[in-house]
Amino acid sequence: MIGQKTLYSFFSPSPARKRHAPSPEPAVQGTGVAGVPEESGDAAAIPAKKAPAGQEEPGTPPSSPLSAEQLDRIQRNKAAALLRLAARNVPVGFGESWKKHLSGEFGKPYFIKLMGFVAEERKHYTVYPPPHQVFTWTQMCDIKDVKVVILGQDPYHGPNQAHGLCFSVQRPVPPPPSLENIYKELSTDIEDFVHPGHGDLSGWAKQGVLLLNAVLTVRAHQANSHKERGWEQFTDAVVSWLNQNSNGLVFLLWGSYAQKKGSAIDRKRHHVLQTAHPSPLSVYRGFFGCRHFSKTNELLQKSGKKPIDWKEL
């Protein structure tokens, strides 16, 4: 039909048009509906508009990457932000020297989640030890004065027992069976050792014996109730720092759990003594007669360090 185009005509070459004399006025590109400019068939015929000052011209290659100085500034700002976050999350009663070297953990998502979990648990249940005693092990000596590391698993879950040192209980709570077996081994291994009549091992901790549980809190009367909540990752970080930044430490790994946790210890740099756990269930499988306490002192003396007075309780 005259005056109408077929679909095919849109894909056919346009017939040549007659050239008319130039108009005395400058040509202006026409507009279509609502004043929108019609597209020209030849983009090269339309002068390109210059981008405003400060903007890249269309089609120009992307700008060069950030300079080394800019990247360094970004990293420093990020590190400063993490430090501020860590400072807000410092737990109650965390020793200063330990905080200096371990505060990097406080801003990590797992630790923030862990602190939230423990806080929520305390709202609904009795949790041991109380908040100000969870990190007793950081208050007894400077992190750089640690000489011996004894790894435990889980805090005691009875009233007034756990106070932030593995195997240790507060006075006047009687020593639990595992600690009683430790005292029995001491009485045969260390000359003149006498049962102290209590279970508080703070005297060892003040001499540089780190008494560290893998999990640092527990719900009352429910052993292992706070396992796999993040404590293991945090105490792994503690052991890792000591492993990498100290020399000649003596690690006492009693039982398969402690031995697994200490499997990454550099045995060329430190001393590792392993045996069965002092629990009544396993004490006769190697703990009695292990002589770990006298052996520890021999190793410390070889390293030029002052031995532990195991009687000082």
Swiss-Prot record:
Phenotype upon changing K49 to N/E: Decreases nuclear sorting
A Gene Ontology molecular function term of the record: damaged DNA binding
Ranges of biased composition (kind: Polar residues): 1-12
Impact after mutating Y156 to A/C/S: Acquires thymine-DNA glycosylase activity
Enzyme class: hydrolase
Acetylation keyword on record: yes
Impact upon substituting K50 to N/E: Decreases nuclear sorting
Effect of R19 to N/G: Impairs nuclear sorting
Outcome (variant: R76D): Impairs the interaction with RPA2
Effect of F10A: Loss of interaction with PCNA. Loss of interaction with PCNA and RPA2
Subunit structure: Monomer.
Family: Belongs to the uracil-DNA glycosylase (UDG) superfamily. UNG family.
Protein name as it appears in the record: Uracil-DNA glycosylase
Organism: Homo sapiens (Human)
